[in-house]
Amino acid sequence: MTPSTGPGPALEARIDALVARLDLERKVRLLTGASAWTTHGEPAVGLRAMVLSDGPAGVRGQVDDERSTSANLPSPTALAATWDESLVERLGRLLAAEARRKHADVLLGPTVNLQRTPLGGRHFECLSEDPLLSGRIGAAYVAGVQAGGVAATAKHYVANDSETDRFTVDVRVDERTLRELYLAPFERLVRDGGAWVVMAAYNGVNGSTMTESPLLADPLKREWGFDGVVVSDWSATRSTEASARAALDFVMPGPQGPWGGELVAAVREGRVPEAAVDDKVRRLLRLAARVGALAGVDPAAPAPDRPEGFGGPPMGRAAEEVAGLLRAAAAAGSVLVRNQAATLPLAADGLRRVAVIGPNAAVARTQGGGSVRVTPDHVVSPLDGLRAALVPLGVEVVHALGARIRAGIEPLTASQVSDPETGEPGMRLRFLDAHGEVLRSEHRTTGKLGWYWDDIPGGSPPSR
């Protein structure tokens, strides 16, 4: 594992010169997102917009539905259970290729909060309960992603280890526990992995919400030498002056936020030093240089090869290689806890009929939800997997529904409905304005529909 190297003096001098060319308003504009997933560009200094994408078990991209599929990695908990840093670094390189395929510059992962209880609502996207294991596997993940010229994001800094009241909870923790447990994985990701981005969490620690916390400066920036960007979790920035005076660098999502004109006024009135704004802009330009978003500067690593086109899955041999790597990772992270009477593996020549019982056997449940969720191109349910393995051997596989465990109604699948305009399997989705005029019409192949933040369908006005 080779951590990313720091910027050289020539690049630093150029960044200083670019910052000096911007007036206060343009500098402050750069420090809040342009949308839910993009930064502002600034042609005057050769800066293009950068795209951030959810992770960490895949790269979602800006389109979050069945039209933009993604490689679906095993749960990060399974990745840590492999205890295999080289394998995880390879998976990081795959994520970099996926990010570039979807035109993303920053991957919002890995999550290195600790699994304090099995009831934690997002622990499936964390690596483990052990700070050493989380740090080493997380650093390998970061190194792999950034080897492909894509920024990895260490999140959620720090002590965001419970979903309950995460927006308001104030975690009280002594110095030794904080450093030896909760900060330890982040330190490894910064020092060993060379992470380019760190995400400040929603929660507070010892009286300060994390977007205003002194922990962003020390130990993160000063003691550990972090020279990248500290981005807020989405809508986690609750103040203008306090957050700007802290070591927070970038507010998401945009374009609205507590900085903007309020921060310009705070600087002009002397409540926030302009040097603090300059440091934030300098870090953002440094990140842009690393991912290839700053004109005239070679990225820190070349973009990996990827198929042409936005969001399309790898084809042919590339798809086979990706599937093989994901399958190997899933197997490496699995543990057979007990094998009574050497029942497994089943001897196929002694089988005639196999019963598979339960509704979940027919469902390919490969991931959790929320920020970690992606739309895989292809999944295999336990039932389909057993049939594929056993039926060619002459074994009959019988499925029984068993007890119904789902409350409510399942969404219709594409095979159950047809588009009234084209007759294809699927549905016709129309977006109407307040007067019933069609703003947009599109064919969809899923009954599960959703939109995030300002991802309003084309032509629809934002409801702000």
PLM features per residue range, with description:
Residues 1-464:
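Glycoside hydrolase catalytic-domain context in secreted enzymes
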